[in-house]
Amino acid sequence: MKRIAVLTSGGDAPGMNAAIRAVVRKAISEGMEVYGVNHGYAGLVAGDIFPISSKGVGDKISRGGTFLYSARYPEFANLEGQLAGIEQLKKHGIEGVVVIGGDGSYHGAMRLTEHGFPAVGIPGTIDNDIAGTDYTIGFDTAVNTAVEAIDKLRDTSSSHGRTFVVEVMGRNAGDIALWAGIASGADQIIVPEEEFNIQQVVKTIDDDFKKQGKNHHIIVLAEGVMSGDQFAQELKAAGNTSDLRVTNLGHILRGGSPTARDRVIASWMGSHAVELLKQGKGGFAVGIHNEELVESPILGSAEEGALFSLGEDGKIIVNNPHRARLDFAKLNRSLSR
């Protein structure tokens, strides 16, 4: 394999630039040429493809976001979009692709491989919700950003004797809420993976103020449960009498310079992705399990360890989906009382 491409797709995540840098420099060290694709699959279809040199990634490891830009491009799920992208790959003489992103990005990589273009996936999303890996690029930075913000909110919360609901990203997974909640000493953590009783939440708030003598209360809420504003309304309807404020950390969690861990993991994964292409292992994704690099086929059966399989209706099924550490929720309950 003499020429490969790299693209980022879906939501941006701190550490994506470190992964791109590793792909470029590892590939060049192996005698390959590397091309970047701007704006993900949309840029692939449009032919927004250009050569990248080792010097071109020299100052990127510390930068957040992705200098290749990113976009969601659902049209790539259609055969027409896939064939248009493949035509551009052929036009540029590209023989393999590294795709950095989440589940949707992996689906695109799977389709490219099915059409004869080897593609390897690298998990890049702050939500940490990808099957086949314990850890996704951007998660550590997002958690640290959330903790820093919650620590500051605690200062103002305790100054005024208030309850704060802090909404964090996590549409399908509560990992950011769990990790940030524990690290910041939150009083309650609400995640999609665990049922909650709104009356019990209100009782815990009351007990903290009236029985425990606390002068503030912090609730970390994953967005996949409901919005912070809706949660506040439900608290009020359930009888909450404390002075309540809602803060949505939102997209701030995606920004900022990546942590050392995100930079190292991204570099490790990026380098290994090139090794997989070199070995002809298209259709695989890189991951981390028990602090070791692992690789999983993107499409196949659950028994084969594949990330996805196809149902009888042709719809994509997630095999062994990522599960949040709910034992962390139990840990937080024991530490916050």
From Swiss-Prot:
Mg(2+) binds at D103. One of its GO terms (cellular component) is 6-phosphofructokinase complex. Substrate binds at T125, I126, D127, R162, M169, G170, R171, E223, R245, H251, I252, L253, R254. Its cofactor is Mg(2+). It is an enzyme of class 2 (transferase). ADP binds at R21, A22, V23, V24, R25, R154, G185, A186, D187, K214, N215, H216. The keyword Transmembrane helix does not apply. It is found in: Cytoplasm. Gene3D superfamilies: 3.40.50.450, Phosphofructokinase domain (3.40.50.460). Signal peptide: none annotated. GO terms for biological process: canonical glycolysis; fructose 1,6-bisphosphate metabolic process; fructose 6-phosphate metabolic process. ATP binds at G11, R72, Y73, G102, D103, G104, S105. Allosterically activated by ADP and other diphosphonucleosides, and allosterically inhibited by phosphoenolpyruvate. It catalyses: beta-D-fructose 6-phosphate + ATP = beta-D-fructose 1,6-bisphosphate + ADP + H(+). Homotetramer. This is ATP-dependent 6-phosphofructokinase. It comes from Streptococcus uberis (strain ATCC BAA-854 / 0140J).
